């Protein structure tokens, strides 16, 4: 059994490709793949990433400081679509 990371290498290091990865996972599960038991998404309130600034008051709330992330709305849509199609 396997849990698939939709980001990092599976998205070619581009967080915006996570939707393509979850679509492929959806197709695999729909086709009968029983090996996949879960997935991981890089997600935050708002998309993208930012550097940690000395003056943290200048930083944007809800944007990752580590890996680039999809936003909350896209996260909800991807998960709802997965649930609807498996």
Regions found by a protein language model. Give the residues of each.
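Expand to "…catalyze enediolate/carbanion chemistry for C-C bond making/breaking, isomerization
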Residues: 1-86
């Amino acid at each position: 059994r396997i849990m698939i990371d939709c980001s990092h290498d599976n998205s070619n290091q581009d967080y915006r490709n996570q939707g393509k990865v979850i679509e492929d996972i959806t197709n695999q599960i729909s086709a009968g793949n029983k090996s996949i038991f879960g997935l991981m998404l890089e997600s935050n309130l708002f998309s993208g990433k930012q550097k940690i600034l000395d003056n943290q008051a200048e930083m944007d709330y809800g944007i990752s400081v580590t890996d680039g992330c999809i936003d909350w709305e896209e996260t909800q849509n991807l998960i709802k679509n997965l649930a609807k199609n498996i």
